[in-house]
């Protein structure tokens, strides 16, 4: 039985990943969310963790998150509406803490167990926006996602222990957030994608599932699912 932690599990991608994993009897799922729990219809017992990651610190983290996860997926995506010209240190620090530092801390705390079990699968997430300097109002978010592409050398060395760590650079995806964008603006954005279409939630979730379930060789990689951008 393997223990899975999904951070940011109430996102569209998170819900799709849960739906694909929930029928697996060999997995124990722990789903983190901030405000609203993911809407999943299943009789299977799921450990729901409601917590604003900004309130996590080194003293209380082990009371909220366990330290023996076998699989960790970070889908946290806190966005603050700030550009480079008006960002505040407080908001940038908050965004980086939520999207990057706390997930790294949670990952670090489970590595000892992964080494002992000689198994670990970790998927972090980044954004195609960092390739272009981020959006005009997503400076802090894009900076935090850039940080998520940093793979510590200590983690790189764990490949020999069957602990595989990868970061997905996710392209513009057909989620609720993008559906709320003015249609004309969204069409203009799609035209910038060589594949000339948005990624589907299935596209992204399928890669996540592959990396945690079927992957036996890919590690320490930034995997782009961006339609050619």
Please report, for each region that a protein language model flagged, where it lies by residue.
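Conserved NAD(P)H cofactor-binding loop of Rossmann-fold oxidoreductase domains
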Residues: 75-81, 228
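A short, exposed helix-loop element centered on a Lys and neighboring polar residues
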Residues: 107-108, 153
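Substrate-binding pocket helix/loop in short-chain dehydrogenase/reductase
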Residues: 83-84, 91-93, 178, 189
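N-terminal Rossmann NAD(P)H-binding glycine-rich loop of SDR-like oxidoreductase domains
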Residues: 10, 14-18
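C-terminal substrate-recognition "lid" of short-chain dehydrogenase/reductases
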Residues: 119, 198-225
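Catalytic loop of short-chain dehydrogenase/reductase
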Residues: 121-159, 172
């Amino acid at each position: 039985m393997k223990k899975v932690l999904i951070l940011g599990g109430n996102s569209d991608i998170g819900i799709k990943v849960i739906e694909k994993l929930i029928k697996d009897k060999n997995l124990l799922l722990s789903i983190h969310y901030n405000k609203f729990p993911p809407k999943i219809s299943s009789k299977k017992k799921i450990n729901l963790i409601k917590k604003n990651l900004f309130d996590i610190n080194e003293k209380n983290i082990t009371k909220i998150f366990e330290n023996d996860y076998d699989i960790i997926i970070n889908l946290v995506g806190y966005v603050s509406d700030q550009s480079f010209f008006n960002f505040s240190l407080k908001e940038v620090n908050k965004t980086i803490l939520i999207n990057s530092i706390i997930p790294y801390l949670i990952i670090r705390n489970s590595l000892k167990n992964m080494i002992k079990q000689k198994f670990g699968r970790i998927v972090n997430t980044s954004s195609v926006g960092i390739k272009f300097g981020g959006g005009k109002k997503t400076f802090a978010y894009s900076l935090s996602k850039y940080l998520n592409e940093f793979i510590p050398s200590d983690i790189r060395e764990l490949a020999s222990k069957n602990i595989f760590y990868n970061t997905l650079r996710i392209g513009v995806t057909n989620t609720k957030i993008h559906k709320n964008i003015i249609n004309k603006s969204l069409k203009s954005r799609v035209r910038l994608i060589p594949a000339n279409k948005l990624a589907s939630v299935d596209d992204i979730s399928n890669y996540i599932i592959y990396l945690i379930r079927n992957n036996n060789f890919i590690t320490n990689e930034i995997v782009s699912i961006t339609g050619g951008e």
